Amino acid sequence: MREVETIFQRLTPERIIFISDSCYSGATAGRTFATASRRAVVSETFLSRLSKGKGRVVLTASKASEVSEEREDLGHGVFTYYLLEGLKGKADADKDGIVTVDEAYSYVSKKVPEATGQNQHPVKKGEVEGQLVLGQVH
């Protein structure tokens, strides 16, 4: 994880969101989705909100001392499964069609411990000014 820290120190963009679904990932300090049948559409509201937030945020699947669970029935790690569900709209708490880092973290920090019998707890670290946007719900 020291390599990740070194990379972060060399980067100068206004916004960085680093997401890690790996065991002991809590020790670490925008993508558009489209399917063959549906084109990705980016709204003006999404672009406006995307350009406002500033900061560096790290979302990890678990605390530094925890193992990140993989579940065959979910097809992913538990954290990734609930993060993807959140980006599909379940994390959009205010129903504005935009999922922010805070909304996604709030969603996974509730769902992941529930699904793992309180054995795994996502972590959010970093400094943010305003809201950082992760995605738009279609």
Task: Spell out what each predicted region is.
Residues 1-138:
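Cysteine endopeptidase catalytic domains of the caspase/legumain-like
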